[in-house]
Amino acid sequence: MEHLISLFVRSIFVDNMIFAFFLGMCSYLAVSKNVKNAVGLGIAVTFVLVVTLPVNYLLQTKVLAANAIIEGVDLSFLSFILFIAVIAAIVQLVEMIVERFSPSLYASLGIFLPLIAVNCAIMGASLFMQQRITLGESDPKFIGGIADAVSYALGSGIGWLLAIVGLAAIREKMAYSDVPAPLKGLGITFITVGLMAMAFMCFSGLNI
């Protein structure tokens, strides 16, 4: 249980997909103009992560790993193709659900909802998971089972959600601020993201 909590907390604060690895920046910047859309996309990304990582974990350990299916056969070279296929299938499911139950959110997110399929935060989490499987059990980043994969996925998703909602809230306030003309738009947004990333650096020394 301690290891699950450690994975969860680390993936939110220490190994945050946005502020530590700058993954998923395209949709992060594009959809963070208001809090409502940011929450919707953040929840969608979290759901996709929680579903895809355990599936990709099983693929990695039961199919792709060396000697997993046949002795002497290593199918790890297929990981990119299979991981992307799983992610694309889950994103298609999420898109249909959002369109069915929240047409206004579906219209607001536009092209960025299906683009979750190529969101590098989703693929990055699967590749980090693949790497962490090989670590020793004493390593706090070790992923050694479905529960670990779910904990890491949920933490990564919540970390991404917090990052995009935080930026959206700030950008809503900045809309009424007297921002210098040369910095309006993406200029002040990049500065804000940089300051937020620096704030999250205070968690980098945590050993949990």
Where are these regions (language model features)?
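Ordered, amphipathic secondary-structure segments that act as subunit-interaction surfaces
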Residues: 61-109
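Structural signature of hydrophobic alpha-helical transmembrane segments
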Residues: 6-20, 73-87, 150-163
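Hydrophobic core segments of alpha-helical transmembrane domains in multi-pass membrane transport
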Residues: 23-27, 45-51, 84-93, 118-125, ...
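Juxtamembrane transmembrane-helix termini in multi-pass membrane transport proteins
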Residues: 6-47
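Generic transmembrane alpha-helix signature in multi-pass membrane proteins
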Residues: 22-30, 95-101, 112-113, 120-139
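Cytoplasmic-side transmembrane-helix entry/capping segments in multi-pass membrane proteins
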Residues: 37-47, 78-83, 105-116, 182-188
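Interfacial loop-to-transmembrane junctions
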Residues: 172-190
